[in-house]
Amino acid sequence: MLDRRESAVNAVIAMAKGTAAVAIGAAALMGQSVQGAPAAAFPDPSRVAKLSSAFEDVDRTFRAYADREHIPGAVWGIVIDGRLAHVGVTGYRDVAAKSPVDSGTIFRIASMTKSFTALAILKLRDEGKLSLDDPAEKWVPELARLRYPTTDSPKITIRHLMSHAEGFPEDNPWGDQQLAVTDEQMSRMMREGIPFSNAPGVAYEYSNYGFAILGRIVTKASGMPYRRYISQTILRPLGMTSTTLEPRDVPAGRIAQGYRWEDEQWKLEPQLPDGAFGSMGGMLTSARDLGVYVGMYLSAWPPHDGPETGPVKRSSMREMQQVQRPRPASVTRASNGALQLYNGGYAFGLGVSGDCNFAHIVAHSGGLPGFGSLMRWLPEYGVGIIAFGNRTYTNWAGPASDAFAIMLKTGGLVPRIPQPSAVLTARREAVSRLVMQWDDRLADSLAAVNLFLDRSRDRRKAEIEKLRAEVGPCRAGTGFDVVENALRGQWTMPCDRGALRVSITLAPTAPA
């Protein structure tokens, strides 16, 4: 019976006259502007304390994994609300010298560099220096001689390169060994041609080459070398003083040596120098610096008022965290044996996915000879994980998933809840009055143009009066049960013989 009553009320007041432009509606009702619209917020004031209670178990998880996988040294961290809240370490940065890893040890992060490159491109776009839909050959003339796979293939654009949709073949680990090539060598490679595995714009295929070309575009559009542009416009404003593209810039007492596990022993891998392919995988950084970097992306959520404080606009950082090129769904098995369904795709220099626990996961891993790294965060939860290891292609995906599962059990890993706009709250109060005592003039003032065309006012009045007769006199209740967004919500009206569930969606119109 309750379900029938709920659906009836929903149908009766499915649309109330409001506004999709909250500023106009709020000003008419409450004297507020859109800048006063509340941002989504965390409901539990003890959330951070609960998350902190998971740190010891997270440390045990990462240490056990490092031991099991023969990782010489590892660092991991947890970022909460834009701050590096915890760092854990184990093992050695230099096996021969028995030099331990610490929170300031600097590791290569390989393909995680791609997000820095994408961020630089969006910054240049925001400054009007390029368009994502520019043909890549506008900035890299060597690409004008490419032989496309079909006569109807579009020219490769910057957008294609940013989302691995340019049609180049997957090139791991070939790309790793190209880091040190010179600009002239790269130009010669491009002039000699690049084969296509797909026409541009039709499929995702991971391309280190594509992000190397983006580095060339950053250089051309900014008027300064890629490395300098990244340092001056992104790293320096963020205070990332331990981050660089050149291993020779790192003090010997801080750099992690890279190893491979072979013949039951660790074997030293040479440090690959920076070169023309650095924009796809050359970055080195520390846990502190990467915590700042991940915190920057988390700070872009939720959309909110206030000055821009980062090197790139918050809206552009959110754009980076939205799927641009979908990938097929996959099923994997978690460490506890549970099946997990993943869907998502590639964004701009970042991967985006969803699973059975979290709808929006942003991440990128990195792997080079001697190193493996990961950054992963949950925008709606304000929490991220970072990890570094100095063994070839260390895969941190499993421990990171386990760490989120541990935090989930504390009850502190919860998403922000949307807050109602002033106009939605005003409409809830008015609709509650209408349900308690029908008034034709009030109904007319609330109704969107469709409401009484879909079903006449007299019929809707009769339906509400019938419900009220069944459950008895009703009261307005206090607040919303569910706020889906600033203009849609549900609440409960307690009645003498039951309750009514009410939902409203405000129409995309401004009040007269």
Show the residue positions of the predicted features:
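Bacterial N-terminal signal peptides that target proteins for export
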Residues: L2-V22
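Active-site SXXK
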Residues: D59-F62, W76, G82, R108-D133, ...
